[in-house]
Amino acid sequence: MYIKRTVEKSILEAAKSFPCIVLYGPRQVGKSTTLDYVFPANFNRVTLDDTEDRELAEKNPKLFLEVNPWPIIIDEIQKVPALLDAIKIKIDEQRKIWLKNNEERKLMYVLIGSNRFELQQGISETLAGRCGIIEMSSFTLREKKAMEAHLFTPKIEVLIQRSQQEKSEYLTRTQIFEEIYKGGMPDICTNVSERNIYYKSYVNT
């Protein structure tokens, strides 16, 4: 069962503004699952966890992008930093074509990564101004409870109104501690894995 994520809205907004999106966050928080839900099946998908794909990307980034044309979702992008330069060239070439033909620009690349610091360095040096960067975390309480996510506001009257509307959804102190103890990793929240075994394995790997 797919649980709707708050970050979906940010992803769709970035898709309208940039030819490239970078979605990063810890392992197993649902990045690939969310993108599979948000983007249609006509997006190619490849992961650099795959040995053959990774070797091709390392040896010949240009050929890799020709074999795997856009629109494409590339997972574990931080494993092949050299691919960012090839993506930059592809984006710049396509931008010229769109400009010449007076065409609306499209989303070309969606890059997924789990190492924030390696990603930020490569992106700031190579893809600055060409991509929207979005961070994704594990489930929030609102996501787990299917509650509407509101933008922050300092207006007291709005906060009071929201408080009144959500009284029926308040948790008891015991429930709050249970939610903190359980955490927000998707495999636990969807009862795929047992908590203690899951976190022990997660930390050890």
Model-based region annotation:
Residues M1-A15:
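N-terminal pre-Walker A segment at the start of P-loop NTPase domains
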Residues L23:
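Hydrophobic anchor at the beta1->P-loop junction of P-loop NTPases
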Residues K31-S32:
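Conserved lysine of the Walker
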Residues L35-D36:
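Post-Walker A alpha-helix
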Residues F43-P71:
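Short glycine-rich substrate-engagement loop in P-loop NTPases that contacts/grips substrate
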Residues L84-L111, N115, S124-E125:
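Conserved catalytic/switch belt of AAA+ P-loop NTPases
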Residues F117-G132, K145-H150:
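Short regulatory helix/loop adjacent to the ATP-binding pocket of P-loop NTPases
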Residues L141-R142, A146-T205:
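Interdomain hinge/linker elements that couple catalytic modules in large macromolecular machines
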